[in-house]
Amino acid sequence: MSKVASIVDVLQGKVAIGETVTVRGWVRTRRDSKAGLSFLAVYDGSCFDPIQAIINNDIKNYESEILRLTTGCSVIVTGKVVESPSEGQAVELQAEKVEVTGFVEDPDTYPMAAKRHSIEYLREVAHLRPRTNIIGAVSRVRHCLSQAIHRFFHEQGFYWVATPLITASDTEGAGEMFRVSTLDLENLPRSENGKVDFSQDFFGKESFLTVSGQLNGETYACALSKIYTFGPTFRAENSNTTRHLAEFWMVEPEVAFATLADNAKLAEDMLKYVFRAVLAERKDDLQFFEKHVDKDVITRLENFVNSDFAQIDYTDAIDVLLKSGKKFEFPVSWGIDLSSEHERFLAEEYFKSPVVVKNYPKDIKAFYMRLNDDGKTVAAMDVLAPGIGEIIGGSQREERLEVLDKRMEEMGLNPDDYWWYRDLRKYGSVPHSGFGLGFERLIVYVTGVQNIRDVIPFPRAPRNANF
C-alpha cells in the first residue's frame, strides 16, 4: 500500500523520485491529448500549486470516469513520482490508479467553474470561495500570520489569556455594541419607569458582545506580567466600507510595568517578526499576490522589516501636516483625530517608513489612557504603516485611581459598571501598557487584497450574516 502525502511534500521533494505515493484532492483542470493521455491538475490546499497527474488510457476507469472529470471533482490519485519534462514544476505523478470520490453534479452550473471570477461574486458564494486561488492563498497567509503571532509572544514569555466574548463593559466607551439577550422581543418585561427590565434577562443585567478583550486582559497582566489575547471582537458600527467588519479578530498584548516607549518597541518587534515569517514561509502565495493583486506586496514587506520606525508627537505631526502645503479632504487642526489620508501622508510621503504617532489629545481617546503631565494629552500611540495607515493602536494605561475616576466622570461613564477594573488600581497598582492589532487589517496589508471582507472566511457586516 502506497503512503499518503500532501501535495506540498511531493512538490518540495520530500518524496523521492521513483517512489509510489497517494495524493488526495480536487481537480483544478483536465486536458486530454490525442496520444491517449489525460493531464489532471490536482490541488489539496497544502500549497498554492497543484500537482500534475498523467493518466494513461489503459487505466480501467479511464473511459467511464476520467474523461468525465471536471473542475471541482474530488479524486484520490496513486502513482509514481517522476521528474517533469515541462517547465514550472520539478515533479509530476505517473498515475497508476485514480479513484473518483465525488463528481460535480452539473459542471455547467458549478459556481466555481474554471474561469476567472470577480472578488465581489466570490462573496456571494463564500462557502465555495476557499477553492479559488486567491482565497486559498489568503487562508494560508492568515494561518501563517496567526501562528507567527502566537510564536512571537510565546518566545517573549507572554501567556495567552482567553477573555470573554460576552461582557457588561464597553471598553471603548463608544456604545456601538451588540446586545446579548434571551428576552422575548414580543413581550419584553418592563420596569416601573417603562424601560426594559434586564434584571429578568439571562445574565441579570444588560450584556453585550465584546468590543475588546483589553480590560479583562489588564487583570491578568497585573498578575502574570505579560499576557496577550487573540480572539473575535464585535462592533455594531453601521459602516459599509472596505475597512470595516462587524466581527473581526484582535491581537491585544498587555504588559505590567511597561511604558509607552516599551509598548512602541513591542509593536515594532512583533510586526517585523510576523512579516519575516510570512516572507519565509508563504513565498508561493505572496508571489501570486504580487503577480495578480498588488505588485508591491513583497517589496513593501521587505522594506518594512528593514526600516527603523520613526516616532513623532501628535502635536508635531499636526505641524507637519499644516506645513505640508497639501490640500487634504479633512482639514487639519490640533484636536482632530487623524484620518487615513493624514496617516498615509505621514508614513508614505513624509517619513517614508512606519511611524509611531504618540501623545494624542485626551478628548479623542478612551478613558483608560494615561493622562500626561500637560493635562491635555494622553500616553496613546498609533503605528502607521505605508500603504494602509493605522495598523496598531495602543497606550499606557491610567494606573492612578483618582485620575481614572475623573476621566470616567468627564466621559459620562458610571464607575460602578467598572468596579472590578477600578480594583486593579486599589490593590498593588502598577504602570502598564498594551495595544490592539486588528488581525484582518494586518492580512489586508500583507496580501494587498483591498476589501477586508475578503480576508476573513465568513464576513459579518451590515445586512450580511449569510453562511
Swiss-Prot record:
Question: Where does the protein end up?
Answer: Cytoplasm
Task: Name a GO molecular-function annotation.
Answer: asparagine-tRNA ligase activity
What keywords appear on the UniProt entry?
A: Aminoacyl-tRNA synthetase, ATP-binding, Cytoplasm, Ligase, Nucleotide-binding, Protein biosynthesis
Please name the Pfam families in this protein's record.
Answer: tRNA-synt_2 (PF00152), tRNA_anti-codon (PF01336)
The yes or no answer to whether the keyword Protein biosynthesis is present is yes
Where does the signal sequence lie? none
Q: Mind telling me which InterPro entries this protein's record contains?
A: Aa-tRNA-synt_II, aa-tRNA-synth_II, aa-tRNA-synth_II/BPL/LPL, Asn-tRNA-ligase, Asp/Asn-tRNA-synth_IIb, NA-bd_OB-fold, NA-bd_OB_tRNA
**Coiled coil regions in record:** none
Question: According to its UniProt record, which reaction does this protein catalyse?
Answer: tRNA(Asn) + L-asparagine + ATP = L-asparaginyl-tRNA(Asn) + AMP + diphosphate + H(+)
Q: Please provide, in alphabetical order, the Gene Ontology terms of the cellular component aspect for this entry.
A: cytoplasm
UniProt record, GO biological process: asparaginyl-tRNA aminoacylation
User: Per the UniProt record, which EC number(s) apply here?
Assistant: 6.1.1.22
Summarize subunit and interaction data from the UniProt record for this chain.
Homodimer.
Question: What family does the database annotate?
Answer: Belongs to the class-II aminoacyl-tRNA synthetase family.
Q: What is this protein called?
A: Asparagine--tRNA ligase
* Native species: Haemophilus influenzae (strain PittEE)
